[in-house]
Regions:
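Conserved Lys-Pro-Asp/Glu-containing loop-to-beta segment of HAD-superfamily phosphomonoesterases
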Residues: 50-78
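Charged phosphate-binding loop/patch that engages nucleotide di/tri-phosphates or the phosphate backbone
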Residues: 9-12, 50, 87-109
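Short catalytic/ligand-binding loop motif for oxyanion handling, primarily in non-cytosolic enzymes
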Residues: 20-22, 29-33, 61-62, 73-76, ...
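Acidic, Mg2+-coordinating phosphoryl-transfer loop and its flanking beta/alpha structural elements
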Residues: 67-101
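A structural signal for isolated positions on well-ordered beta-strands in alpha/beta enzyme cores
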Residues: 19-21, 65, 82
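Short, acidic loop-to-helix structural element flanking the phosphoryl-transfer center
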Residues: 1-22, 29-34
Length: 109
């Protein structure tokens, strides 16, 4: 799987300024966990394994912000909800959009 353009630079800078966690609802496919962890370690080596949260449902996550490409993950989140634009979510317009990682950087850095 390819890394989204500018994601590594932006996440690295965010990590220097904020408490960043990568949350994945990967439990639906538990056999994918080792590959996901390996991929994250390879492409985001500046993140510590304690910053990775694998869960069955993202509604258990609390924080100030959540960036996600799936609207249903944002609906129950109590903080600010940011929808990362993807082909499968173009019909949703009730969340603030982040169209790319440069926009994420502009918002937070």
């Amino acid at each position: 799987m390819e890394v989204n353009e500018h994601s590594q630079e932006v996440v690295k800078k965010l990590n220097e300024k904020y408490d960043v966690f990568i949350v994945s609802s990967a439990m639906e496919f538990p056999n994918s966990l080792p590959e996901k962890l390996e991929w994250l370690g390879e492409h985001f080596p500046f993140l510590h394994w304690k910053q990775f949260v694998f869960c069955g449902n993202k509604k258990v996550v609390h924080g100030d912000y959540m960036i996600d490409d799936l609207p249903h993950n944002l609906e129950t989140f109590n903080g600010e909800k940011l929808l990362f634009t993807a082909p499968h979510n173009m019909q949703f317009n009730h969340f603030q959009r982040m169209n790319n990682w440069k926009e994420v950087g502009e918002k937070f850095l």
